[in-house]
Amino acid sequence: MITLITWEHESSKPEVREFETVAACYNLAANGGFYKAQIVNEVGVVDYEF
């Protein structure tokens, strides 16, 4: 499972979502309009940060 952690604005609490594919996760992270988004792989390493 791929994890997406998003922040709506600088002082908001992070929201965590899980995805089956990196492509779906990347699409939401890149186009979701978030203040910050991190894509975390299965071993807990941040692969992408927007």
Residue ranges and their predicted role:
Residues 2-9:
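A short beta-strand micro-motif
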Residues 11-23, 46:
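A short, exposed loop/beta-hairpin motif centered on an aromatic-Gly-Thr core
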Residues 22-33:
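Short, surface-exposed linear segments at secondary-structure transitions and domain or protein termini
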